[in-house]
Amino acid sequence: MDALIEAARSPDYPAEISLVLSNKPDAPGLMKAKKAGVAVAAVDHKIYAGREEFERAIQILLETYSIDLICLAGFMRLLTPWFINNWRHKLINIHPALLPAYRGLNTHERALADGVKIHGCTVHYVAPEMDEGPIIAQAAICVWDTDTPDTLGARVLEQEHHLYPTVLKLIASDTLKIKGNRVLGFEEKNNSVLKVPKFP
C-alpha cells in the first residue's frame, strides 16, 4: 500500500489512490494512509451476518468513492464469487510467490523447504479460486543458501514494492490486454532482471 501511495504522488502517474479500506478498524495502514492525505474507511467483517452482507457494505463504499480498480494488499479474507465477478478484471492482488507455485500462506517457508533456487512475487487478476486468475507480472530473485524465511521475505517484499506500482501504472494507462488466461503488454523492458552465475 505504501508503495502505491508513494508512486501516485508523482504528477505524471496515471492513477490516483482514492480510498484505503480495511476490514480491521485498527489496521496500521489506515493511519499511514490518513497521514498521507488519502481517504480511509474500515468495514469490520465481524459485525455482519456473513460474507455477502459484508461485501455489499464494501460495494456501497466503493461506489460512493467512484472506484475503478481495487488493489488488494494484505487483505486476508476470501472474497465471494459475487464480489469477484462484479469486479472482473478490475480487482488485482499481489502474492508473495511465483504463481502457480505456493498458493496460500507461508510461501517463503515452503519455498525454502522445497529447496527452490528462484522465488519472487506475482501480481494477478483475482478469480473466485484462491490465488488464481490471469498473471499480469512477476518479479523473481535468487534464493541464497543462507536465506531464512525472514530474509527471503524481506527481499521479495522489495520486489513487491517495485512491481505493484508498475502494474497499476500499466493498467491505468490502458496498456494491458487480456487474451484468455494471458495478460499481454507487460513489455520485456519492465521485466525483473534475474542475475544468474556464469558457468565455464
Which residues does each predicted region cover?
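Residue-level detector of anion-binding/catalytic polar loops
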Residues: 39, 68, 117
